[in-house]
């Protein structure tokens, strides 16, 4: 027994010596013991700007230092979802950038969703290599918290732009993405920036069985992305005869930091994105914080009193907009139940002891 103990102690000494030698040769932090170096137990996350998606992601938002892919069909709400994320990071005093490869950023729409466009870094690159070099520079600066690339399909290689119409450039974009992601993955992780790639869907030719849909830019992004979110447009939302939006499903098809395949059902309203009150209402109904009796919705407050919200979803959501205290209470209850970040104003409003819950500080985004 004593022999085994001395052998184990000797192994530990040799291991310590090996780690020190590798660090000496390759630099501090190049190799480390898991128990002494890396700590994934307290994963730094940034809220996505959509409460339903924060719940579906399992960790309360997008993890820092990771690559995220948001993909879907045309006009499904991909850019809207990314703009909500930009606005959320800016609320936490973060620095954000938008690489507009499609040259289609609607500044007024971004402003309506809460993005401070005066403080938004915007780039409209001429070709794919330039766009990815700009992303690399932003990441390596260590000051940009969130970078959105819209979109992968628009990252056209320089050779294709300079070539003639009809020239074959098979696999050029896929090679470009593969090379760029090999270079970006390490620097993104070290800088703690979040990079969101928006991607489009294409149909594979000749697929008889299985899903014929695929994303552009090859398969490298599928491998390097920590989280992949599919945005799928559903039934139209109508107000009378007019369509005012679409029911949209956000499905987490890949997740390296929590269980995947969870989904969020949200309302995408034209000109407003994903309204907070609609999102909270949908979650509250699903989790029975709001009771439904036929077409009527009611809510039981903290004092046990039943409050009627109205007949139908539209009237009930309008009631929540007119009564922000009830909306705040529902948001606080949902965030606490799912162990999500609770903003300061909700803690001060509903907790006597301000030390309870997860607080969001303006400095927290920069420190993590």
UniProtKB/Swiss-Prot annotation:
The keyword Membrane appears for this protein: no
Gene Ontology terms: biological process: DNA recombination; DNA repair; SOS response
Annotated compartments: Cytoplasm
rRNA-binding is among the record's keywords: no
Pfam family name, one: RecA
Domain of life per record: Bacteria
Alphabetical list of InterPro entries matching this protein: AAA+_ATPase (IPR003593), DNA_recomb/repair_RecA (IPR013765), DNA_recomb/repair_RecA_CS (IPR020584), P-loop_NTPase (IPR027417), RecA-like_C (IPR049261), RecA-like_N (IPR049428), RecA_ATP-bd (IPR020588), RecA_C_sf (IPR023400)
One Gene Ontology molecular-function label: ATP hydrolysis activity
PROSITE patterns reported for this sequence: RECA_1, RECA_2, RECA_3
Recorded GO CC terms: cytosol
Residues binding ATP, per UniProt: 72-79
Keywords: ATP-binding, Cytoplasm, DNA damage, DNA recombination, DNA repair, DNA-binding, Nucleotide-binding, SOS response
Biological role: Can catalyze the hydrolysis of ATP in the presence of single-stranded DNA, the ATP-dependent uptake of single-stranded DNA by duplex DNA, and the ATP-dependent hybridization of homologous single-stranded DNAs. It interacts with LexA causing its activation and leading to its autocatalytic cleavage.
Similarity remark: Belongs to the RecA family.
Protein name as catalogued: Protein RecA
Organism for this UniProt entry: Petrotoga mobilis (strain DSM 10674 / SJ95)
Gene this protein is translated from: recA
């Amino acid at each position: 027994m004593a022999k085994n103990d001395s052998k184990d102690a000797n192994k530990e000494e040799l291991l310590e010596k090996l780690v020190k030698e590798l660090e000496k040769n390759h630099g501090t932090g190049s190799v480390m013991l898991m128990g002494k170096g890396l700590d994934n137990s307290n994963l730094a996350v940034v809220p996505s700007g959509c409460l339903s998606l924060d719940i579906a992601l399992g960790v309360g938002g997008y993890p820092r230092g990771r690559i995220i892919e948001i993909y879907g069909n045309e006009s499904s709400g991909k850019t809207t979802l990314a703009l909500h994320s930009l606005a959320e990071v800016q609320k936490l005093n973060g620095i954000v950038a938008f690489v507009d490869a499609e040259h289609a950023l609607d500044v007024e729409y971004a402003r309506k969703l809460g993005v401070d466009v005066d403080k938004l870094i915007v780039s409209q690159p001429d070709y794919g290599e330039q766009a990815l070099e700009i992303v690399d520079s932003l990441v390596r600066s260590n000051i940009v918290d969130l970078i959105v690339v819209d979109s992968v399909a628009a990252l056209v290689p320089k050779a294709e732009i300079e070539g003639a119409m009809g020239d074959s450039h098979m696999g050029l974009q896929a090679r470009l993405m593969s090379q760029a992601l090999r270079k970006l993955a390490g620097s993104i992780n070290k800088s703690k920036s979040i990079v969101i790639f928006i991607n489009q869907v294409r149909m594979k030719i000749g697929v008889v069985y299985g899903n014929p849909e695929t994303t552009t830019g090859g398969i490298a992004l599928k491998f390097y992305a920590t989280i992949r979110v599919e945005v799928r447009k559903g039934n139209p939302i109508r107000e009378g005869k007019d369509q005012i939006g679409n029911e949209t499903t956000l499905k987490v098809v890949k997740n390296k930091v929590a269980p995947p395949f969870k989904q969020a059902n949200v309302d995408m309203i034209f000109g407003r994105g994903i309204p907070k009150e609609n999102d909270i209402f949908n979650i509250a109904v699903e989790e029975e914080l709001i009771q439904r009796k036929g077409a009527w919705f009611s809510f039981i407050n903290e004092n046990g009193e039943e409050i009627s919200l109205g007949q139908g979803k539209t009237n009930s959501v309008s009631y929540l907009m007119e009564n922000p205290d009830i909306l705040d209470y529902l948001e606080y209850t949902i965030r606490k139940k799912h162990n999500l970040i609770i903003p300061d104003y909700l803690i001060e409003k509903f907790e006597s002891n301000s030390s309870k819950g997860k607080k969001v500080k303006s400095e927290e985004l920069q420190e993590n």
